[in-house]
């Protein structure tokens, strides 16, 4: 896979270019450059660790939006088996901005669904860049109710800039679809685990984000509005997005400190896109243990604990 580097990763990119140049030279003649390549690789790893240990909130937001960031389909392929996609809300359309269906996790049936932004231009347009419309949320709710009926746990992957704000979506009652999902998910009698893998934008994320366990990846973000949007409103200047990101507390660490999520999962060095297999492996182990624990909780107690979890958010002494 071709690597893409963000602006703050420029020193890492320069070192990688030197390493690749030495590899090409070494393959063209009999000069042994393995020691020099190994030295530069060690230096590159050290530099990467140093840069990523002190990222600013705005830089983390850029990581959450990285064009190579793993998407729902990447995790489905690596974590689950026997995935059978289910389409449509049975009222309007196939609803492709959210992908979902039945699968198996270690042989056990689960319902898995999540935002899908798309990777190439044609797919991005088809997926509406991962911005769900009312039909996507109604489709998601249909699948979750099916999971409840067949006693399957639900796993959701959240990665969206927000719910689609188009006229058509509003005409089809976007706010009602989101509100209905919030209400229904708080009462669905089956374990629900929600994972924020990239950016989680406001109600568009919450509509599939009410669960028994809420998990964020290390370089994911959760916010009521994008940093650019916040800066445009407060300072009438989108270029102040960095300042807005710092003030909003959108990073996984800050969200965890505020007790809005249950845990933060460390990513491979340089981000989840650097080693998708390892990231998926970590999530698979975590999902396995969390679902095993949740299945042992009586359903009535599970629903009460879920309700109390969200009612406690934002409470002050």
Swiss-Prot record:
<keyword id="KW-0443">Lipid metabolism</keyword>
<comment type="subunit">
    <text>Acetyl-CoA carboxylase is a heterohexamer composed of biotin carboxyl carrier protein (AccB), biotin carboxylase (AccC) and two subunits each of ACCase subunit alpha (AccA) and ACCase subunit beta (AccD).</text>
</comment>
<keyword id="KW-0444">Lipid biosynthesis</keyword>
<dbReference type="Pfam" id="PF03255">
    <property type="entry name" value="ACCA"/>
</dbReference>
<dbReference type="GO" id="GO:0006633">
    <property type="term" value="P:fatty acid biosynthetic process"/>
</dbReference>
<keyword id="KW-0275">Fatty acid biosynthesis</keyword>
<dbReference type="GO" id="GO:2001295">
    <property type="term" value="P:malonyl-CoA biosynthetic process"/>
</dbReference>
<dbReference type="InterPro" id="IPR001095">
    <property type="entry name" value="Acetyl_CoA_COase_a_su"/>
</dbReference>
<dbReference type="GO" id="GO:0009317">
    <property type="term" value="C:acetyl-CoA carboxylase complex"/>
</dbReference>
<dbReference type="InterPro" id="IPR011763">
    <property type="entry name" value="COA_CT_C"/>
</dbReference>
<dbReference type="GO" id="GO:0005524">
    <property type="term" value="F:ATP binding"/>
</dbReference>
<keyword id="KW-0067">ATP-binding</keyword>
<dbReference type="GO" id="GO:0016743">
    <property type="term" value="F:carboxyl- or carbamoyltransferase activity"/>
</dbReference>
<feature type="domain" description="CoA carboxyltransferase C-terminal">
    <location>
        <begin position="32"/>
        <end position="293"/>
    </location>
</feature>
<keyword id="KW-0276">Fatty acid metabolism</keyword>
<dbReference type="GO" id="GO:0003989">
    <property type="term" value="F:acetyl-CoA carboxylase activity"/>
</dbReference>
<keyword id="KW-0963">Cytoplasm</keyword>
<protein>
    <recommendedName>
        <fullName>Acetyl-coenzyme A carboxylase carboxyl transferase subunit alpha</fullName>
        <ecNumber>2.1.3.15</ecNumber>
    </recommendedName>
</protein>
<comment type="similarity">
    <text>Belongs to the AccA family.</text>
</comment>
<comment type="function">
    <text>Component of the acetyl coenzyme A carboxylase (ACC) complex. First, biotin carboxylase catalyzes the carboxylation of biotin on its carrier protein (BCCP) and then the CO(2) group is transferred by the carboxyltransferase to acetyl-CoA to form malonyl-CoA.</text>
</comment>
<comment type="pathway">
    <text>Lipid metabolism; malonyl-CoA biosynthesis; malonyl-CoA from acetyl-CoA: step 1/1.</text>
</comment>
<keyword id="KW-0547">Nucleotide-binding</keyword>
<dbReference type="InterPro" id="IPR029045">
    <property type="entry name" value="ClpP/crotonase-like_dom_sf"/>
</dbReference>
<keyword id="KW-0808">Transferase</keyword>
